Amino acid sequence: MVAQIHYHKNSKLSIRRNKKGSGFLYINKNGKPVSGARSSRISKLVIPPGWHDVLVSADPKNYIQAVGMDAKGRKQYIYHPLWVKKNQERKFDQMVDFGERLPTLREAVKANMRDRTLTRDRIVATIVWLLEHTFIRVGNKTYAKDNQSYGLTTMREKHVDIKGNKVTFSFEGKSGVFHELGVSHPKIAQTIRECMDIPGYELFTYFDEDKNKRVVDSSDVNEYLKTHTGMDFSAKDFRTWGGSVLAGDSLYKKGNATTETDLKKNITDVVAIVSTHLGNTKKVCRTYYIHPTIIKSYEENILVPHYARSYSRKSSGGISLTSEEYATWSLIKDS
């Protein structure tokens, strides 16, 4: 059960890995090699041999089981499988609520993007718009510092180029993946241009009422989301929502498969489409960013007729979503 999971971030990471011959030796906090069940548990974690500065949790139920630095100097984590499973289920479970509240959030974003002065809300609204339209991760300071990889809130001025209304982002994201993508929007371009007029390397900055320079971070984004939705959504929910909507519509366009071979091929093709848009591997996309109802309903020949009925309707049930979004939302809601 999830109640068994413990939440010690660093205090329980007391086992270190030392090189020994062609293998490794794990040493506890008393300087003695681990053995027995603890040694067996560590082996099952399959910690990459290329990691260095590896620390392992002494608690088999800790949500973080191991940390280490990869070959590029990026901090990596191995989490308890029960924690991963529950965290993912919770994220998928809130997709219906996310869809219901998305129109209200969009109205707030639209209004704040029209602010005449460079306020915190105007910048956060700009970031939220970019989250939805580019699928760029929100980023966090710790990850940027440890791994030299970036997201929207940790972006630097050197990562951005503006020509007229077009903004191009070029940066290294999570797992060392290089991203280059652009958007064309006058208000987005203007806000970023004004941010870049403020001295400093951080991109999303502003001056508060006391003329103090402030840097917008991921906590500002999550606070904004809660203010305008009333729920604890995070920037990651945009990627799950976007990946699920794209997968559902793409499978609908494939039509019902007539053979098992076609079924597998269609699903594989669509997962690849989502993978390209999100910048993740196919395995990660299918596991974490496509709601399981999408794949399951396609396999059961439910998805295509559902989308066909939904697209033929004149109304979206009083919810201001696009036709693709409403079809996806209602499929998940009714599952």
At which residue positions do the language-model features occur?
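A positively charged, amphipathic N-terminal helix/segment that binds anionic biomolecules
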Residues: 1-150, 154-267, 271-278, 285-287, ...
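Acidic, low-complexity interaction regions
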Residues: 261-335
